[in-house]
Amino acid sequence: MSGNVILVGFMGAGKSSVGRLLARRLGRCFVETDDMITAREGRSVPEVFAERGEAYFRALEEETVRLLALKSSDVIATGGGLFCREGRPEALKALGTVVWLAGDFDVLYERARRAGERPMLAGRGRDEVEALYRAREPFYRQADLTVDTTGIGPDQVAAQILLALREIPSPLGRGPQGEPPPEARRAHQREGRP
């Protein structure tokens, strides 16, 4: 498993805000899949949706997932639907630790509405958006870690993710920051190693 930390979740979960904070605290690069798409297309996500449609955007996301395989130790914030296609959970989990930023639907919906241009909100009523959230939930539940963002700010969410990441053993016996797990640190200290 590579050292990427991949944030998934519904719109309004705070993936961008939390991702920036987390990257800063881990000393890593921050990447947003929507930014990768807008850089390639030369236009915003809402413009891509309006001009080319959702199917075209989803094809761009598929290409973006392939490009993410080139990343090895970044913090990556995904678009809300990127994780929610057959085979995507497995593909992204192969690239790093996937963290679902969960939350109460009503809270997420209000955050997304306040944030402005959200193509998946355009022309949809609250009930339709909730149905979309419920359809995506089974995918999100496949993440390696879940952090509930309801009632806490991005700083606290990032702190919870950092704590959870330190508990995950890596195949090399090192945590996401390259630190040996606590029991290995104690053994190294007894042996006089750093």
Stretches with model-predicted labels:
Residues 29-93, 117, 126, 137-139:
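ATP-dependent small-molecule kinase phosphotransfer cores
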Residues 80-82, 104-106, 152-153:
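Short glycine-rich anion-binding loops that position phosphate/pyrophosphate groups of nucleotides
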Residues 10-13:
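P-loop (Walker A) phosphate-binding loop of NTP-binding proteins
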Residues 2, 21, 25, 71, ...:
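NTP-dependent small-molecule kinase module
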Residues 94-138:
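A glycine- and Lys/Arg-enriched "phosphate-lid" helix/loop adjacent to the NTP-binding pocket
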Residues 7:
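Hydrophobic anchor at the beta1->P-loop junction of P-loop NTPases
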Residues 16:
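Walker A/P-loop
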